[in-house]
């Protein structure tokens, strides 16, 4: 921590396994070394992503540190965020995998999405994100980086295109063709009609995708 002139934060799990829950001890040492914020995922290392995150066990970390505490794991809507905060005593939540293909989700959970922002068409949002990635990474790397996001969007927005269209979307090397496919595959309906409420769940749509 002393080697840099920027704030240093730490993310950890509850411990190695149920027999070694050492997050409180590690958090105490981290704060003593100068760590300014700690995030705890409510599973052990050995759980990977199996089972449910135990937000209540994060409270033991809250009891021993004074720096901001963030709780993470299985948080995907305002209700689960509220429960995680209540059970852990944390100051904030971190949304992870639930935001894959749903970049609007943190804003919905926090209640900070501007009025009208969800009126953008689903295919418009995906196109904007795709072009932003190409602009940031450049064409060769951006094309590859974008593919995982396109896959997540297909899942989150419950798009089920014909296999040949899905394959072409995930393998096309010309950005112009990818944008054409996005316009064809993803709904032209506003996100406010494509997803349901604060949970960010999708309504299945069929905009001529059987081709």
What do the PLM-derived regions correspond to, one by one?
Residues 1, 10-12, 28:
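Conserved beta-alpha-beta core of the PfkB/ribokinase-like small-molecule kinase fold
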Residues 3-5, 19-37, 49, 56, ...:
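Alpha/beta catalytic cores of nucleotide-metabolism and tRNA/nucleoside-modifying enzymes
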Residues 10-14, 42, 71-73, 97:
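A cross-domain feature marking catalytic cores of carbohydrate-active enzymes
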Residues 40-50:
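Glycine-rich, proline-tolerant flexible connector loops at the mouths of alpha/beta enzymes
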């Amino acid at each position: 921590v002393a080697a840099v002139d920027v704030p240093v934060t730490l993310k950890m799990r509850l411990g190695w396994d149920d027999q070694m829950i050492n997050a409180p001890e590690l958090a105490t040492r981290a704060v003593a070394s100068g760590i300014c914020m700690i995030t705890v995922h409510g599973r052990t290392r050995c759980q990977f992503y199996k089972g449910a995150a135990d937000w209540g066990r994060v409270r033991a970390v809250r009891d021993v540190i004074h720096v901001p505490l963030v709780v993470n794991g299985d948080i995907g809507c305002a209700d689960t965020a509220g429960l995680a905060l209540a059970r852990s005593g944390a100051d904030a939540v971190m949304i992870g995998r639930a935001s894959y293909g749903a970049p609007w989700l943190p804003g919905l959970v926090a209640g900070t999405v501007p009025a009208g922002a969800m009126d953008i068409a689903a295919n418009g949002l995906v196109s904007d994100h795709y072009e932003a990635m190409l602009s940031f990474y450049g064409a060769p790397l951006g094309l590859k980086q974008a593919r995982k996001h396109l896959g997540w969007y297909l899942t989150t927005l419950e798009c089920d295109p014909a296999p040949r269209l899905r394959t072409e979307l995930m393998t096309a090397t010309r950005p112009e063709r990818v944008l054409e496919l996005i316009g064809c595959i993803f709904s032209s309906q506003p996100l406010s009609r494509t997803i349901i409420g604060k949970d960010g769940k999708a309504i299945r749509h069929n905009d001529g995708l059987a081709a």
